[in-house]
Structure formats: structure tokens, C-alpha cells
């Protein structure tokens, strides 16, 4: 699939112990592309991997075996599969707490508000959390449409209609991925919201390992209205 889209990725990572159970937590700059890349990265190390997604994505048949649906619409099967995966002794899990791809926020590309469920589940199911930073941007067109929509007070995410085209615009891209150290919630202070904020900060702190990262975002910033 990556060869067909002419995209690839490089990974800088810390040593992870294979027999731990992890929840990998990442930012979401591209949408589908980063999910596929991170799933591929994890499958190169572990044979049993699940990606936590909106249960509507279960209709994408080629990747269905990877998906772990969030019970967003009250579907009993989704809830059972989700908790079964969390309890699994072997399955490594990947989640994007923002639930949607990044937008232009405060002068740079960043996720919108993170959901905190991953913190509760990591604590309840005794999983370590591994922060991952994926470096990348969509086109300035995507972010400008988002800004215009917000300015007009429209609640419908019309910019999402561009995501397929944005995927093809990534042709020839080599994405940088940084995997951080595993975090144990037992060593973190604060409630669920505070822990989620700390972990989000850990994710974005990893971008310091990306050469010329600031230059990439500055080039996009020059085209934002």
C-alpha cells in the first residue's frame, strides 16, 4: 500500500520490552495515513496489534482485522470487542486521542482536544502508555477551509471531504516518527485530565528530535490566511 502511494517513514525509538502490554498514543496529523504507518510499524515487532478507531471504520474491509471499534453509538459488539482487546495478554494497542486529524491551532499544526478515555483504560487494564510523535502536515488549503468554517460558525467538518485528495498529495513523502519512553501512570500525579495533558505534552515534546521540524511548519504558516 505504501509503495502504491509512494510514501515511506523513518522511526527513531527507545528500547521497548516485548513482554509489556502497551497503549501507543499518537498525534494525528494526516488522518488515515499515520494510522496505517503506525500499524505497520507495530506489526513489524508484534504479531497481535489493534488500532482503536471510530466503529464506523469497521466497514473498511481490508483493514478490519486491525480495527478495535470504540463503542460510540451504543453497539454491544463494539463494546465487547474493545474491552476484550484491552484485557488481552498479547495485543498491543494504538490510539489517537484526538479522534480526528490535526488542525491549525495557535500558529501551528496540532491536535484538537484529546479524549481522556485512554488514561482510564490504561490504569484499569494495567497497561503502560507509549507516546508517539508523527511529523507532518496537510496542505494549507485544508487548514484554511477549517479556519473559514470556524469563522462562519459552521459545525459540519466540510474540510474532511478533502482527506482523500490530501492522501494523494502525500505522494513522495518520507514521514518522521519518534517513539518515546514508556510511561507508567502510577508514577504520574493528578487526575485523568491532568495525566492526559501531561501525555499530550510528552507527545509534542518528541518533535525536538525531528531535524528542521520548525522550518516545515513555517513553510505552511506562510500560506495560512
Question: Where are the regions that the model predicts?
Answer:
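A transmembrane-helix-recognition feature enriched in membrane-embedded lipid enzymes
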Residues: 1-5
Amino acid at each position: 500500500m505504501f509503495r502504491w502511494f509512494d510514501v515511506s517513514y523513518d522511526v527513531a525509538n527507545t528500547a521497548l520490552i516485548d513482554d509489556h502490554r502497551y497503549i501507543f498514543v499518537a498525534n494525528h496529523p494526516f488522518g488515515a495515513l499515520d494510522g496505517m504507518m503506525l500499524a505497520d510499524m507495530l506489526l513489524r515487532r508484534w504479531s497481535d496489534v489493534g488500532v482503536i478507531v471510530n466503529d464506523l471504520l469497521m466497514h473498511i474491509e481490508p483493514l478490519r482485522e486491525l480495527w478495535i471499534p470504540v463503542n460510540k453509538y451504543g453497539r454491544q459488539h463494539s463494546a465487547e470487542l474493545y474491552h476484550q482487546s484491552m484485557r488481552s495478554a498479547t495485543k498491543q494497542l494504538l490510539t489517537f486521542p484526538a479522534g480526528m486529524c490535526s488542525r491549525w491551532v495557535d500558529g501551528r499544526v496540532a491536535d484538537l482536544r484529546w479524549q481522556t478515555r485512554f488514561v482510564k483504560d490504561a490504569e484499569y487494564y494495567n497497561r503502560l502508555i507509549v507516546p508517539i510523535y508523527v511529523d507532518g502536515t496537510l496542505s494549507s488549503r485544508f487548514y484554511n477551509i477549517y479556519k473559514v468554517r470556524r469563522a462562519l460558525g459552521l459545525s459540519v467538518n466540510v474540510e474532511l471531504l478533502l482527506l482523500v485528495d490530501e492522501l494523494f498529495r502525500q505522494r513522495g513523502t518520507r514521514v518522521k516518527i519518534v517513539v518515546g519512553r514508556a510511561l507508567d501512570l502510577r508514577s504520574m500525579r493528578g487526575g485523568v485530565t491532568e495525566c492526559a495533558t501531561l501525555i499530550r505534552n510528552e507527545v509534542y515534546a518528541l518533535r525536538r528530535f525531528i531535524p528542521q521540524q520548525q522550518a516545515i511548519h513555517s513553510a505552511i504558516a506562510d500560506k495560512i490566511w
